[in-house]
Amino acid sequence: MNNTAWWIIIFILILLILAAGEIYRETHTFRVRKYKVKTKKNIGIQNCVKVIFLSDLHNCVYGNKNDKLYKAIQAEMPDMILIGGDMLVAKEGSSVQEALEFVKKLPHICQVYYTNGNHEQRMKENTDIYGDTYERYKAKLENCGVCFLENKAENIEKNGMKFSIYGLELDSSVNRKFKKADVTEKTVEEKIGKKGKDYSILMAHNPAYMDAYKKWGADLILSGHLHGGLVRCPGIGAVVTPQGFLFP
């Protein structure tokens, strides 16, 4: 083997090591991103309302019992925490304990609203596989003060601001790989009813149906599911989604 071939092999090995390091970093660290959302609607704002949005932890733990993440949320002093689903992993033999122990602490900070992702929904619907694991998980969190929004809405008045939070749970078929379901404004309305007059925050786990959410009339849409893309490239961003769609 000549020197050129050896250098090519070394270069490929370095790339693989760097890629492995980046994957480890992305799955073992988190970053707090801040957004300021403004509206032209007259909704009686006297002060701002600070919201923490969490989604798709998939049993991931940052520090001892998720201490690092909990303290980071606590330091932000939010008015409420919204959870967009997939905090656990629906897989035979997988425990919900990590998600349960973390989420049950959050009401000590502020009110928590939880909308299911495809993993919670899979666990809820497939009782032949998971038994009553989901119902027990939900009941324990509700006992700690977590409010589940499963195709439900909650009317909120906070800091002089009136708004509604909707939790949308579409049929499991919307999450099939390599195929988009036919989700329309009417589909959303059938699940959660017509949008009210107040400013509306819609939590809908899968963003693939964003057009339907917009046409329904949501003022602010919060989704997860994409994980920033299963495959990402520098300068391009997400290339492949968990459902197998390109360039989300």
What are these regions (language model features)?
Residues M1-I45:
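N-terminal membrane-anchoring alpha-helices
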Residues K38-I52, V146, A153-I165, K195-K197:
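Beta-strand-turn-beta hairpins that frame and shape the catalytic cleft
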Residues I45-C147:
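Membrane-embedded segments
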Residues L54-N59, G85-M87, N118-E120, K152-A153, ...:
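Active-site metal-binding loops of divalent metal-dependent hydrolases
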Residues L57-Y62, V89-G93, K177-K180, Y199-S200, ...:
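Short, flexible loop segments at the rims of nucleotide/cofactor-binding pockets, characterized by
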Residues D79-M80, Y113, V146-C147, F163, ...:
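Short, Asp-centered acidic motifs that coordinate Mg2+ and/or phosphate
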Residues K124-G145, K158-S200, M210-D211, W216:
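Binuclear metal-dependent hydrolase catalytic cores centered on His/Asp/Glu-rich metal-binding motifs
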Residues N143, I201, N206-P248:
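Conserved beta-sheet core of the metallophosphoesterase superfamily
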